[in-house]
Amino acid sequence: MQLGLSRAGVTGVQKAVRMQHGGSDALVSAEIDCFVDLDPAQKGVHMSRFPELFEEAIDELVIGEMLLVERLAEHIARHIVARQDALRAEVRIAARYPIERSTPVTGLRTQELVSLLGIAAASRTASRRLVGVEATGINACPCAQGLVRDQAAERLGEAGFADVDIERILELVPLATHNQRGRGTLYLGTELRLDAEDLVDIVEQSMSSPIYELLKRPDELFVVEHAHLSPRFVEDSVRLMVKSSLDAYGELRDEDFVMARQVNFETIHNHDVLAERFGTVGELRAELANGGHSPTHTELGDWLRAV
């Protein structure tokens, strides 16, 4: 039967990749997915050859700084197209990488694991790549906090406090709400060389507060208070990720791509909440400039298929 396939390949291939950052090497575990497009004349692909081709591509590419996982994805995609005689290849890589952090008050050194993400697509004539990160934080719910504020104001009024004093008290005292651990993901599709830790900062700062593996009591107090002074909806985090990315990288071209995604894990519900935004830089800039709805939200798959 002569019928082309949209994709055929392998998923979940585990490889150890040596990466350099800050003058030291780190051996990290990477998970690789790879697919190729098949034209009607091709019966199939050599599935068993994919891991071998990954090894060849990794050996050929000297990985420099930590975020170059996207360059590796692009190199593998090109290698697969050439060696498998495919029309097109798409590669996705996810690697867990340790970064050093200092806690906000005591300065305690702590190691946090973040996900470095690389996506690339290659045809016989061109290629595109995205660099991404995934990081966790905490979001304090603004809605519940508003309810607590209203009730606190009512009780203070019943206790005889003047309105001006009530407002002052509510400004000074952190207000309770329910918290959500959040996972933010940010992808940028560009030829620019970006620093992955800068992307992690953008993701973490879009939430109410970063979180840390180790915390002394003064640090714990700071994180909790800071989060409750910066309540965020899941939608707020996505909008902040997009805006911060465009502000930080003004040299992005209009045809470059941004995708931001936030998942908050609920504590008082049995469901979780999600928001995301994707599109070309030009689409996002235009919408932020005029405040009107953009009729086009270019999706990741469409952006990758432009090659």
Residue ranges and their predicted role:
Residues M1-V307:
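N-terminal intrinsically disordered, cationic/polar leader segments
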